């Protein structure tokens, strides 16, 4: 068992225990002493003398840890005498607490001590005697037997020196070493000047690959250090860095002569050891007997047996002397190397041995100037590997030409060694992460360095230092620069808008499919036209349009459905079809395109699902990559989820599969479901396009789609989905069957239906946009502050009578929904909110909880107004009035479904009289009385429309997705400008295109009620922000009392009349008579720009910057007139720019126009992010 590193009892002076440097604090102290000492000073191998009381962690001699030590005790030792000699020593309290070493020695033990103890047993006593022979201390070392003392020669210096003497000696040796280094540097400079660049390279090759002889390769006349005892370095000189820990690690190699160098040491330290092999071996041999010196020159030579190679190209079988020298020399720099990972390993200077060893052991501080450059040249791992390969190729060429045996910084390089050996040091060197990071942070603006290309011209940047690797100040950067065209192509490809691959169905041989599955029953065929008309009138007044419309059925058995569908219908408890189902199912089963309009909750979903199941089961099963057969598109995610749930009972019975695909959910799950195969897909248009465009159209396709349904079709086109819906329709086979269903169908939809349907049958049940008669409608005109109190009254009345009832409250903005949620929660009503700004998972869970009765009240925007079917929903409150008739019908239609009754209460304020028209019309069509106050509001609004003060709008008609596309492109253009990299010519060429995109996107902020729509949307008419800037010269004022006074007054009168239009014309005099009036002026009208754009060119910060840069005078004049307001005598808001020269005025105008562009884009971006207001953003 190895003895612990902290021993309590003193070891005999001179024994190898006292010379062991096994204390970590000793290592640190030795490093500090070595840093302060001069080069070449003697080193002491024993710990410094110190007071025993200060050693708080000493262990007792009686510990069993010393049983395996090589501390050989004499059998005649009198232990009592030893105790008496130390009995009077003063002990610290801590020592009493820790008297036994066996309690905690394991947690403080270093496992390496076991190996060192084993190595010491294998080493001979003579080896230790030789190492200690030249010890500089005046001590009497104990022999291995413990009884004899080595007769070491007396040293010239006293054993104990004063601090002044030590300091003087260190300074003297430091000066000698500096003088020697200066002479050596001067000699190298002279040789460089005499030999030129070619000779310098040859010298590098000689130095990198030459034999480690004691003579300098560049100065053959300089005598080498003689191999005689008399001329050896005196014993008092410092013999290089000596680390007993490293010697103990290497001693184990002597147990087997067949061990290779790579197996004796960890791979991390082998690279360091190879670099210091030659110099440290010479330092050791200088202190040994003279017979060992002659072998030093052969240590780095090529081994005799070339075939047996170690990992560093060294012979695995060498002589004993060579092994001993290598083992002791390999890891002498262990401490310093572990502390400074990035320090450059020193090469062999062209000087005598003793001074070289001293400088190496003490860590030369005055290194060459290009050390930092070499460290920076490390680069990435790929660059370092490329550099090493290039260096290896050059070294191979030099090996073939060189006559002497090569060596490189102590590494033996063999001609037949594998090539990676030459890069072992670079690849195995571990770089400290902090040092590497600080190295990278040295110059953040420096250009990237390339280590893969070495050019001979680089020699000029480092002409004074013969190093194999040079600085990279002049390195060619072309190897790192990618082709700008390729980068632009990649960026364009990444930014390319995903599109659906177009399919030319005319060139495809598509298999035919069957549409008509309906056979008219006998009892219906026998009915006359009068009887059919009476039947339709009884069924909620069904109205049909089209040719050869089938007669309405009266029972499920007459619909032509298969047995499995009828069984599921029976289990679900559907006794008889509803009015829309009686007329729509026969028409769809006949293979006709159908437009169905029916009141909310009338069973429209089942009306198109049942024929779809029969349509799909008639076709062949899906194979391989076949896409779906039935496609159902909805405007909202909630409606898609609800339709998918209604499909599930039928899917299980018929063995079909359906996928619900909508935005906000994880697309990879939906792709996985589609790849497994699905006959039906229920989706929103946006997600459908994403799926079709994903993976270049290989995820799914529409080639097998023959049955298409658009549920709530009017709302889908109202929300702007028409481009997407038409894009999907264009990729479906033309002879498909198409079904359109909705509770409301404005007349504007007729033109769209004609484009997508072929000879459709139109079915209207109960009117086009009518609230169900089972719903009680209440409209109240109230102030905004009275709404919440009235809501609390309604909730209290409802839940006093029916605790299980549900309430749905509609608001117009997302922020309003959250605010109302907070207010109701404070009043004790459990509720939740749902709107488009919430995550899809939250929206789904909220609806599920509302249906299950977890929360009885839900606050929602119009996102929940379509298709939401909740049982026990007794009350619907329109807290904010709906903006058009169809929205009101769908909101009210959430209650009173499937024959149940319900109540819809609507709040409307005096300021919302434009909404009174649609609400009053809905009340009239459903047969309910219109309140007098509401009727007055409607009349007042119609009168204002007739007078032109107001403009009537139906609230229908989406803007399409071009608006969002333009905003998206404008945002990307702004980001490209902000993050543009300097020197990229392509970016400069694209600036004009980006500006066009900005202006195009700015079109969305143009007021809708503008009387004169501009040619370029977003920019007022007559203003070209990209055009030429017109600067006018200021005319001198007319002289008072001139004959032209009358003419001037007449001109003023004309100008006064012209100013009434609010337009700035070239003939209008500019009010620039103040002290800042300049010789030139220009005007820029900003009245019709968005608010953010106007603010950008009028706020103090921006104006001050322009004034400071151009020296002009900028004044805001005129008055702001909102859109539609009549312009008075004062002109519209404009900016007057005045300056002494035309150039400064032009520059100021250009900067103002730039600010206008940015402000316009900011307004467009803000509107695009939150089109309905609120603090939520859907990304």
Swiss-Prot record:
Residues 1-167, 180-241, 250-269, 318-427, 941-994 are annotated as: Disordered. The Q motif is unique to and characteristic of the DEAD box family of RNA helicases and controls ATP binding and hydrolysis. Its main location: nucleus. It catalyses: ATP + H2O = ADP + phosphate + H(+). This is Pre-mRNA-processing ATP-dependent RNA helicase prp5. ATP-dependent RNA helicase involved spliceosome assembly and in nuclear splicing. Catalyzes an ATP-dependent conformational change of U2 snRNP. Bridges U1 and U2 snRNPs and enables stable U2 snRNP association with intron RNA. A motif (Q motif) lies at residues 554-582. It comes from Botryotinia fuckeliana (strain B05.10) (Noble rot fungus). Residues 23-93, 101-137, 180-192, 319-344, 391-401, 941-953, 960-973 have a biased composition (Basic and acidic residues). ATP binds at residues 598-605.
């Amino acid at each position: 068992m190895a003895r612990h590193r902290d021993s309590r009892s003193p070891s005999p002076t001179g024994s190898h225990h006292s010379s062991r440097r096994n204390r970590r604090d000793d290592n640190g102290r030795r490093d500090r002493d070595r840093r302060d000492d001069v080069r070449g000073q003697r080193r002491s191998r024993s710990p410094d003398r110190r007071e025993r009381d200060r050693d708080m962690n000493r262990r007792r001699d009686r510990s069993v840890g010393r049983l395996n030590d090589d501390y050989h005790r004499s059998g005649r030792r009198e232990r009592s005498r030893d105790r008496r000699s130390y009995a009077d020593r003063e002990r610290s309290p801590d020592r009493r607490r820790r008297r036994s070493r066996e309690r905690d020695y394991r947690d403080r033990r270093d496992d390496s001590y076991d190996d060192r103890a084993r190595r010491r047993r294998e080493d001979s006593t003579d080896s230790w005697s030789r190492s200690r022979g030249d010890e500089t201390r005046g001590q009497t070392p104990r022999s291995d037997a413990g009884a004899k003392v080595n007769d070491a020669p007396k040293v010239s210096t006293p054993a104990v020196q004063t601090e002044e003497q030590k300091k003087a000696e260190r300074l003297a040796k430091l000066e000698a070493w500096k003088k020697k280094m200066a002479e050596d540097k001067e000699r190298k400079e002279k040789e460089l000047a005499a030999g030129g660049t070619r000779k310098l390279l040859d010298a590098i090759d000689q130095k990198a690959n030459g034999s480690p002889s004691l003579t300098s390769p560049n100065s053959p006349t300089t005598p080498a250090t003689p191999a005689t005892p008399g001329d050896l370095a005196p014993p008092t000189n410092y013999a290089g860095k000596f680390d007993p820990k490293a010697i103990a690690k290497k001693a184990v190699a002597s147990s087997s002569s067949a061990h290779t160098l790579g197996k004796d040491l960890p791979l991390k330290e082998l690279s360091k050891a190879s670099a210091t092999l030659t110099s440290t071996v010479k330092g050791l041999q200088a202190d040994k007997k003279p017979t060992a010196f002659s072998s030093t020159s052969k240590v780095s030579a090529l081994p005799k047996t070339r075939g047996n190679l170690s990992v560093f190209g060294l012979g695995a079988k060498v002589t004993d002397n060579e092994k001993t020298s290598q083992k002791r020399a390999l890891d002498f720099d262990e401490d310093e190397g572990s502390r400074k990972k990035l320090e450059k390993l020193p090469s062999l200077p062209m000087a005598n041995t003793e001074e070289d060893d001293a400088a190496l052991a003490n860590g030369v501080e005055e290194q060459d100037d290009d050390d930092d450059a070499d460290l920076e040249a490390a680069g990435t791992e790929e660059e370092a590997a490329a550099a090493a390969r290039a260096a290896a190729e050059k070294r191979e060429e030099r090996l073939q030409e060189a006559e002497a045996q090569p060596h490189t910084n102590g590494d033996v390089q063999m001609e037949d060694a594998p090539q990676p050996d030459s890069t072992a040091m670079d690849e195995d060197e571990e770089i400290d992460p902090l040092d590497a990071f600080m190295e990278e942070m040295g110059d953040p603006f420096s250009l990237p360095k390339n280590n893969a290309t070495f050019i001979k011209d680089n020699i000029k940047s480092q002409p004074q230092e013969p190093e194999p690797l040079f600085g990279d100040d002049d390195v060619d950067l072309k190897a790192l620069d990618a082709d700008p065209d390729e980068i632009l192509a990649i960026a364009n490809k990444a930014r390319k808008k995903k599109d659906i691959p177009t399919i030319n169905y005319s060139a495809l041989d598509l298999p035919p499919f069957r549409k008509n599955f309906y056979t008219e029953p006998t009892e219906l065929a026998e009915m006359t036209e009068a009887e059919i008309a009476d039947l339709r009138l009884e069924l909620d007044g069904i109205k049909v349009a089209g040719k050869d419309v089938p007669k309405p059925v009266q029972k499920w058995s007459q619909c032509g459905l298969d047995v499995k569908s009828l069984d599921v219908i029976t289990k679900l408890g559907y006794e008889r079809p509803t009015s829309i189902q009686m007329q729509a199912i026969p028409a769809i089963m006949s293979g006709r395109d159908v437009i169905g309009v029916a009141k909310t909750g009338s069973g429209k979903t089942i009306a198109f699902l049942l024929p779809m199941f029969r349509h799909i089961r008639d076709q062949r099963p899906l194979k391989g990559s076949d896409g779906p057969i039935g496609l159902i598109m909805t405007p909202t995610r909630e409606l898609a989820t609800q339709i998918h749930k209604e499909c599930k009972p039928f899917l299980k019975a018929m063995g079909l599969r359906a996928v619900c695909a909508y935005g906000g959910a994880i697309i990879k799950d939906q792709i996985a479901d589609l790849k497994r195969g699905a006959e039906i897909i229920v989706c929103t248009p946006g997600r459908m396009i994403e799926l079709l465009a994903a993976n270049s159209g290989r995820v799914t396709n529409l080639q097998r789609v023959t049955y298409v349904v658009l549920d709530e079709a009017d709302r889908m086109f109202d929300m702007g989905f028409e481009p997407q819906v038409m894009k999907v329709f264009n990729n479906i086979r033309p002879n498909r069957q198409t079904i359109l269903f909705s509770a409301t169908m404005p007349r504007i939809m007729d033109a769209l239906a004609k484009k997508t349907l072929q000879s459709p049958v139109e079915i209207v049940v109960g009117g086009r946009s009518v609230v169900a008669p089972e719903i009680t409608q209440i409209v109240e005109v109230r102030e905004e502050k009275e709404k919440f109190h009235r809501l609390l009254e309604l909730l209290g009345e409802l839940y006093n009578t029916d605790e299980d009832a549900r309430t749905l409250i509609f608001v117009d903005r997302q922020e309003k929904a959250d605010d109302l949620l907070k207010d109701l929660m404070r009043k004790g009503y459990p509720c939740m909110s749902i709107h488009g700004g919430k995550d899809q998972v939250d929206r789904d869970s909220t609806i599920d909880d509302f249906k299950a009765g977890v929360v009885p009240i839900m606050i929602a925007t119009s996102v929940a107004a379509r298709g939401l079917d909740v049982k026990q929903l007794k009350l619907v409150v329109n807290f904010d009035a709906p903006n058009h008739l169809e929205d009101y019908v769908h909101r009210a239609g959430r209650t009173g479904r499937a024959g149940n009754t319900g109540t819809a209460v609507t709040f409307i304020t005096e300021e919302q009289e434009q909404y009174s028209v649609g609400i009053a019309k809905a009340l009239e069509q459903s047969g309910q009385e219109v309140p007098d106050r509401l009727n007055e509001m409607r009349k007042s609004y119609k009168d204002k429309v007739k007078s032109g003060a107001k403009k009537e709008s139906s609230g229908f008609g989406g803007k399409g997705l071009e608006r969002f596309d333009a905003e998206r492109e404008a945002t990307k253009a702004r980001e490209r400008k902000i993050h543009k990299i300097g020197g990229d010519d392509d970016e400069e060429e694209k600036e004009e295109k980006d500006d066009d995109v900005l202006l195009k996107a700015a079109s969305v902020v143009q007021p809708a009620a503008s009387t004169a729509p501009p040619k370029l949307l977003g920019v007022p008419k007559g203003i070209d922000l990209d055009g030429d800037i017109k600067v006018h010269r200021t005319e001198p004022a007319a002289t008072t009392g001139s004959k032209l006074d009358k003419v001037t007054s007449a001109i003023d009168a004309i100008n006064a009349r012209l100013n009434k239009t609010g337009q700035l014309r070239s003939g209008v005099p500019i009010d620039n008579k103040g002290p800042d009036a300049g010789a030139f002026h220009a005007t820029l009208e900003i009245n019709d720009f968005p608010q953010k754009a106007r603010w950008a060119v009028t706020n103090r910060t921006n104006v001050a910057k322009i004034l400071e840069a151009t020296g002009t005078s900028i004044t805001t004049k005129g008055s702001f007139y909102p859109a539609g307001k009549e312009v008075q005598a004062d002109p519209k808001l404009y900016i007057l720019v005045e300056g002494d020269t035309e150039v400064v005025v032009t520059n100021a105008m250009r900067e103002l126009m730039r600010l206008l562009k940015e402000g316009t884009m900011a307004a467009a971006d803000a509107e695009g992010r939150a089109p309905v207001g609120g603090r939520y953003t859907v990304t």
